[in-house]
């Protein structure tokens, strides 16, 4: 019982931080930096859950965070957000099972790739499903990819520290997964 209480507390804090960072990105960032593109810090948190949680837990937590972000800070339909997250999860999990090494360097490159993939998948789904699809906005999206990558290492270190503080070994799949990047 104690373990599931810590696991719930761990996710509750992560959800609260995601909510606050998404709020910062959508409101306060523009007060400080004008129209300069904001990093998608919430996407780094979702990536962390994709990489460091068991698949079932990860997808449920990601869907909850997608609902939270979409309902509070986005005009995008929840179905599109969930479809994008499902496609991202499928690709990230597939790559993770082929090669994965825990640490900030892997997370940095995964963040760059996931953010780029997020934009590509989002644009494609928007073009296919929406009557008024999202624009390409190439320079804005490139800036978001770069800034999200740059903020990924501090995000990773904070989330890893939180997992250690909350002693959430059950949630942390990397603790039980062997390093598949090594050649035998």
Residue ranges, per PLM feature:
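Terminal, non-globular segments
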Residues: 1-184
């Amino acid at each position: 019982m104690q373990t599931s209480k810590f696991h719930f507390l761990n996710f509750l804090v992560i959800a609260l931080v995601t909510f606050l960072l998404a709020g910062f990105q959508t409101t306060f960032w523009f007060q400080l930096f004008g129209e300069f593109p904001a990093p998608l810090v919430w996407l780094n948190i979702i990536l962390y859950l994709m990489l460091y949680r068991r698949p079932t837990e990860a997808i449920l937590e990601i869907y909850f965070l997608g609902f939270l972000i979409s309902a509070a800070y986005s005009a995008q339909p929840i179905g599109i957000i969930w479809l994008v997250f499902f496609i991202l999860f499928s690709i990230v999990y597939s790559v993770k099972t082929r090669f994965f090494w825990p640490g900030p360097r892997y997370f940095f490159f995964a963040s760059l790739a996931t953010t780029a993939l997020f934009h590509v998948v989002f644009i494609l789904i928007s073009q296919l499903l929406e009557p008024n699809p999202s624009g390409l906005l190439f320079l804005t999206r490139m800036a978001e990819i770069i800034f999200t990558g740059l903020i990924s290492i501090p995000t990773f270190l904070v989330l890893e520290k939180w997992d250690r503080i909350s002693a959430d070994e059950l949630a942390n799949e990397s603790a039980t997964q062997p390093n598949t990047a090594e050649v035998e």
